[in-house]
């Protein structure tokens, strides 16, 4: 076989949400990329809930899209219901969520990947990471079929497959997902290279035949009439009439009694399964045990697609014996005749505590080796995909001999995610919430393109169409802001509306922009009532109208200014780099705990050091004095992308290959 078949720029191991984004990013940025996964038919598989987004997670999905990722486009094509969560609260914490067709989503991801010319795929299992003789630099991978593939950068995205064990009642067996084999060999190989691993668990609920459910006794949960897309490139979504509904029901005291009969055979209670699981997604038996005073728990009955009757019983994750799950389901209102396609199960798997990775997601022990996704201790498709796109970006940056891209906490939820993992670590599956982001007012889901698309385009990942749309949106906002400032309304035009929303009426004509600052006023309703909507509104690409975006900024103005001050203060610390060989153990004037934690995390700068648990403000002050004494200079305020190192021949690195996929 020709040697070129075995040699690549980047190898991505695993074709889940993380691996798909990593492979797409690296290939779209110009790297010759090989994606190796156990079954090509399972690329982009939704192992658990057939949905993308939610509170915090939806922000991440839109950030991935803004950078030029594929998750948003696949979600919009596969979506069967679209909703904006948290609308009763402020816009900063609104979270888009889409129910997807499970098979349709995987098909859309596969189509996105197959549209990239320099991305190759292989069905095989990687069992060994290859390095140089010193074990310090990655050189490639060896597969189950005995083939060696070489690359200077390897991205590991093993998900739940690394030494995965599935539990259903007293039964347990190897697997990475029900019906699929676990992968073996990588953990032992990484141990030999000096890495430490741990075990985590997650779970999934039973699947049920929707034809056996009585929906008439359940509460209908339709999609939004003004559906919000995930991709900034999407123009059209299904009407609310064309969307499929989800349904709400509840467990009963009888359900709980039936479930308790299986506790003595539950791996969670017998000790057969002692790995930590997701705190915010407990199993139904865990909820009953921990919240014994509650006589019911809400369940969401979610369709798995337009091409199947199968439904997902969200809220009923379980590893109890199959017969107990079946009998308990039949005590739930509307599910008295339920036919169970398959039981829920728990799965435990290997992960590698994230103190072993840099902020670029490159590992500290092996040069050129990157970890992304559940291998770093996260849970959730969006969290995995976010790490995947950043690992793919930074693998190419390494090939370019350019600086790694590290998003700040003030720039993106992706930055919050990675900073939390590296600085704080995790001993349980980590998931994103808006509450984790201290600068969340700046990080709205509607402005992800304004925050990240220009960066994605400079890197050669986001297409020119994306950048043009972002600039068009910004122009629309500027023009509309000027129009709202120049346009006045009289009391006769708007007093009825102002009274109806409970705010004071006008004594004289006032600029529209002034009224938009009032908490009670909806900018679009105000303009419609005044007869100015068609005259003023310039639709901005990216889902929300320009007046709505301006209104949000106006109402948050004071908070935004305060958060920008906080960001500036933190960025001053982040400008102070800490040398790679800095010896914290030699410092007698910081606490022992700080020395130990900082030596383990190895932060890149003072800002990162200040967020390491156990490090005090006084420790940071001492570090700053020491850095100054050693002649360390603060870095420039603006990120240096080292664009000269990115290639400029139009055929190699630096040319976006993001492709629009037409689906018939």
From Swiss-Prot:
GO molecular function: any one? flavin adenine dinucleotide binding
Keywords (A to Z) from UniProt: Cytoplasm, FAD, Flavoprotein, NAD, tRNA processing
Localization = Cytoplasm
The UniProt record gives the binding positions of NAD(+) as: 277-291
Enumerate the residues binding FAD.
14-19, 126, 183, 374
Cofactor(s) needed by this chain: FAD
By its UniProt entry, which InterPro entries does this protein fall under?
FAD/NAD-bd_sf (IPR036188), GIDA_C_N (IPR049312), MnmG (IPR004416), MnmG-rel (IPR002218), MnmG-rel_CS (IPR020595), MnmG_C (IPR026904), MnmG_C_subdom (IPR047001), MnmG_C_subdom_sf (IPR044920)
From which domain of life does this come?
Bacteria
One GO cellular-component annotation of the UniProt record comes to: cytosol
SUPFAM superfamilies for this protein: FAD/NAD(P)-binding domain
Task: Give the coiled coil ranges.
Answer: none
* Self-association state and partner proteins as the record states: Homodimer. Heterotetramer of two MnmE and two MnmG subunits.
Known function: NAD-binding protein involved in the addition of a carboxymethylaminomethyl (cmnm) group at the wobble position (U34) of certain tRNAs, forming tRNA-cmnm(5)s(2)U34.
Report the protein name in the record: tRNA uridine 5-carboxymethylaminomethyl modification enzyme MnmG
- Naturally occurring in which organism (per UniProt): Salinibacter ruber (strain DSM 13855 / M31)
């Amino acid at each position: 076989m020709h040697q070129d078949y075995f040699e690549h720029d980047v190898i991505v191991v695993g074709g889940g949400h993380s691996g798909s984004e990593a492979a797409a990013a690296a290939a779209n940025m110009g790297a010759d990329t090989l994606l190796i996964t156990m079954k090509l038919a399972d690329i982009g598989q939704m192992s658990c809930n057939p949905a993308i987004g939610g509170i915090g997670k939806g922000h991440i999905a839109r950030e991935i899209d803004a950078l030029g990722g594929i998750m948003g486009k696949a979600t919009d094509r596969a979506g069967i219901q679209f909703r904006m969560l948290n609308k009763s609260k402020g816009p900063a914490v609104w979270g888009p969520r889409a129910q997807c067709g499970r098979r349709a989503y995987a098909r859309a991801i596969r189509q996105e990947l197959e549209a990239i010319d320099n991305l190759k795929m292989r069905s095989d299992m990687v069992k060994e990471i290859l390095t140089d003789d010193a074990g310090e630099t990655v050189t490639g991978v060896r597969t189950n079929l005995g083939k060696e593939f070489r690359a200077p950068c390897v991205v590991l995205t093993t998900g739940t497959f690394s030494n995965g064990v599935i539990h259903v009642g007293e039964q347990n067996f190897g697997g990475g997902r029900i019906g699929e084999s676990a992968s073996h060999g990588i953990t032992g190989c990484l141990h030999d290279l000096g890495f430490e691993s741990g075990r985590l668990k997650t779970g999934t609920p039973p699947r049920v035949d929707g034809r056996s459910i009585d929906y008439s006794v359940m509460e209908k949960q339709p999609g939004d009439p003004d559906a919000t897309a995930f991709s900034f490139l999407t123009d059209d979504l299904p009407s609310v009439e064309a969307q499929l509904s989800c349904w709400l029901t509840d467990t009963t005291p009888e359900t709980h009694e039936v479930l308790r009969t299986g506790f003595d055979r539950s791996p969670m209670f017998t000790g057969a399964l002692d790995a930590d699981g997701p705190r915010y997604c407990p199993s139904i038996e865990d909820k009953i045990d921990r919240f014994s005073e509650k006589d019911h728990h809400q369940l969401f009955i979610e369709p798995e697609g337009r091409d199947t009757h199968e439904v997902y019983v969200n809220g009923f994750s379980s590893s109890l014996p199959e017969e107990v799950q079946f009998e308990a389901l039949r005590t739930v209102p509307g599910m008295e005749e339920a036919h169970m396609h398959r039981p829920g199960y728990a799965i435990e798997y290997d992960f590698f505590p994230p103190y072993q990775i840099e902020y670029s997601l490159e590992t500290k022990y092996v040069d050129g080796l990157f970890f992304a996704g559940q291998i770093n201790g996260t849970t959730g498709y969006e969290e995995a995909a976010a790490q995947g796109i950043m690992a793919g970006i930074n693998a190419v940056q390494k090939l370019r001999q350019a600086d790694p891209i590290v998003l700040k906490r003030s720039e993106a939820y992706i930055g919050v995610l990675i900073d939390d993992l590296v600085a704080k670590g995790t001993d349980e599956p980590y998931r994103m919430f808006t509450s984790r982001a201290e600068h969340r007012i700046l990080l709205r889901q509607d402005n992800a393109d304004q925050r990240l698309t220009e960066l994605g385009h400079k890197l050669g990942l986001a297409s020119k169409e994306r950048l043009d749309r972002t600039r068009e949106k910004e122009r629309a906002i500027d023009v509309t802001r000027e129009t709202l400032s120049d346009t006045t309304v009289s009391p006769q035009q708007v007093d009825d509306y102002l009274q109806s929303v409970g705010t004071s009426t006008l004594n004289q004509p006032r600029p529209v922009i002034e009224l938009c600052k009032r908490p009670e006023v909806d900018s679009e309703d105000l303009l419609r009532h005044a007869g100015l909507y068609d005259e003023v509104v310039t639709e901005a690409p990216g889902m929300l109208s320009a007046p709505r975006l301006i209104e949000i900024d106006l109402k948050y103005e004071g908070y935004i200014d305060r958060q920008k001050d906080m960001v500036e203060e933190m960025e001053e610390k982040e400008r102070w780099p800490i040398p790679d060989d800095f010896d914290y153990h030699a410092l007698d004037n910081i606490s022992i705990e700080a020395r130990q934690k900082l030596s383990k995390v190895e932060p890149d700068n003072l800002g990162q050091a200040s967020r390491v648990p156990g490090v005090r403000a006084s420790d940071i002050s001492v570090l700053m004095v020491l850095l100054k004494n050693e002649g360390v200079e603060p870095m420039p305020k603006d990120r240096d992308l080292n664009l000269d190192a990115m290639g400029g021949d139009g055929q190699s690195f630096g040319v976006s290959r993001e492709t629009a996929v037409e689906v018939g």
